[in-house]
Structures are given as structure tokens and as C-alpha cells.
């Protein structure tokens, strides 16, 4: 498994490292982890005032300031990683690097150093989400799970995307720990206020509560039908 972990020295990227460390015993020896730092380029006017070698040393020094504490932390956890830094737009470069590896998983915080407090996701995370086709795990600014076994929610709607999510989770079950619990989640339509107009345009009585529940159950069953065989074959009983 190849994992790409973009870091910027923020508490959010520290949580990404903590999550990786919490999964280390589960990922196995074949896992490859790359730490990636993406630096903003110096303004063109400033860059023209120094030689290319000096400019590269500046970028290397800036990247090392971020790599050093991350490297120290992971080494203490017995985790070996590779490192890479790139200069450019963070979202664009993270997506490009994930494609180049190719990464089986990108792990990053929901925000970084430059995020605005009012955003649900930071601009870089949103940008990566919009650009990449690689699986992306977005971590909130909370401590890494202490227990090996995780509770995993998988949203399904009967589409190929829901099926792909289930296939990914089953292919990388070790990431979630032994004895992990898997929950299938489907959001059904709200029929509570549904009425049926008659030919004269008059509204007939709304659906009964039992009819609404029956319709919602049917939607749910249809949404999980494509993934039932996959789960059964893997010996996973979803909740």
C-alpha cells in the first residue's frame, strides 16, 4: 500500500502523522509512506535577485523545517518514510504527486496553515478533493483512534461509486484494524409530506407513516443490493 501524507507543520498535519502511527502495526511491512511538502514559490521579483542554487537551498531549508519534526516523530514510532518537496500550488501538486506514485491513499487534515476558520474544509483540501481520483482520507483536528478496531461508515446509493467505496474498504481491511465494524449508510428520500394529486388537481391524503417506512426500506435495500455479495465473500457482516 502506498500512502501519501502532505504536511505543512500545522496541528492538522500533525494529526495526520499521529493517525499513520496509530495504524502502523496494521499496515504491514509492504506499506510505503511518502511525506510531501509543497512550498509556495517566491515572488518572481524576489527570485530574480538570487541564483538558482541559492533559491534551491532556500526551498530545501524551508522544507527541512517541516520535515525535521515529522521525521523525528515517526522514527520514534518505528516508521520509515520517504520525503519529497515540490514548489507550486499545493492542491495541484498534491494531486499530481498522488497520481505519479500512484498513491493508494492520501491522508491529510481538513485544514492547514492557510485555512479560514469559517470553512468546513480548507482551500487546499477542497482543491485536492476536486482534482484527485486517488482515495482521500480527510482527518478532523482530533486525536488519532486509540483502539485498533475502528467503526467504519460507508455511504452507498446503489451507484458504482458506492460499490467502489466498499471494494476499497474490503481491499484494505487491515487499515481499520482487526475486528473493525462496518456500517452501510444510505440517505433515503423524505416522503413524510408526500401527497398525490387527483385528476382535478385536488390533493389526496398524505402517505401513512407505515407506507413511508416501507418506501424508505425499499430504497435502502436497493441501494445495498449491489454490495451484499462483495461483503459476504469477504466475510464481513455490515451493521
State where each predicted segment sits.
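General small-molecule cofactor/ligand-binding pocket signal
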Residues: 34-36, 82-86, 137, 183-185, ...
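Structural beta-alpha unit
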Residues: 22, 54-57, 72-106, 229-239
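Structured loop/turn residues at secondary-structure junctions
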Residues: 8, 86, 112, 141, ...
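Fold-core signature of tandem repeat domains
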Residues: 166, 223-224
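Gly/Ser-rich helix-loop-strand patches that form or flank binding pockets
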Residues: 2, 11, 15, 25-26, ...
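A short acidic, glycine-rich active-site loop
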Residues: 53-65, 206-222
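Aromatic/hydrophobic pocket-lining residues that form π-stacking "cages" and hydrophobic walls in ligand
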Residues: 20, 70, 94, 128, ...
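Small/aliphatic-rich secondary-structure junction motif
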Residues: 1-52, 150-209, 229-236
Amino acid at each position: 500500500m502506498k500512502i501519501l501524507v502532505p504536511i505543512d507543520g500545522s496541528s492538522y498535519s500533525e494529526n495526520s502523522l499521529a493517525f499513520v502511527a496509530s495504524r502502523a502495526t496494521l499496515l504491514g511491512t509492504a506499506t510505503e509512506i511518502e511525506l510531501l511538502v509543497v512550498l509556495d514559490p517566491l515572488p518572481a521579483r524576489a527570485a530574480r535577485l538570487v541564483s538558482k542554487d541559492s533559491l534551491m537551498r532556500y526551498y530545501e531549508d524551508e522544507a527541512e523545517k517541516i520535515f525535521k519534526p515529522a521525521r523525528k516523530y515517526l522514527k520514534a514510532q518505528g516508521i520509515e518514510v520517504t520525503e519529497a518537496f515540490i514548489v507550486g500550488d499545493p492542491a495541484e501538486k498534491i494531486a499530481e504527486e498522488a497520481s505519479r506514485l500512484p498513491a493508494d491513499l492520501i491522508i491529510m487534515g481538513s485544514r492547514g496553515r492557510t485555512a479560514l476558520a469559517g470553512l468546513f474544509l480548507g482551500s487546499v483540501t477542497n482543491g485536492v478533493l476536486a482534482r484527485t481520483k486517488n482515495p482521500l482520507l480527510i482527518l478532523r483536528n482530533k486525536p488519532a483512534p486509540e483502539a485498533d478496531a475502528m467503526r467504519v461508515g460507508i455511504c452507498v446509493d446503489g451507484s458504482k461509486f458506492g460499490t467502489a467505496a466498499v471494494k476499497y474498504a474490503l481491499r484494505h481491511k487491515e487499515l481499520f484494524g482487526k475486528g473493525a465494524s462496518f456500517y452501510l449508510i444510505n440517505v433515503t428520500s423524505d416522503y413524510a409530506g408526500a401527497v398525490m394529486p387527483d385528476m382535478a388537481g385536488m390533493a389526496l391524503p398524505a402517505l401513512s407513516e407505515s407506507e413511508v417506512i416501507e418506501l424508505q426500506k425499499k430504497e435502502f435495500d436497493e441501494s445495498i443490493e449491489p454490495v451484499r455479495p462483495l461483503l459476504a465473500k469477504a466475510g464481513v457482516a455490515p451493521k
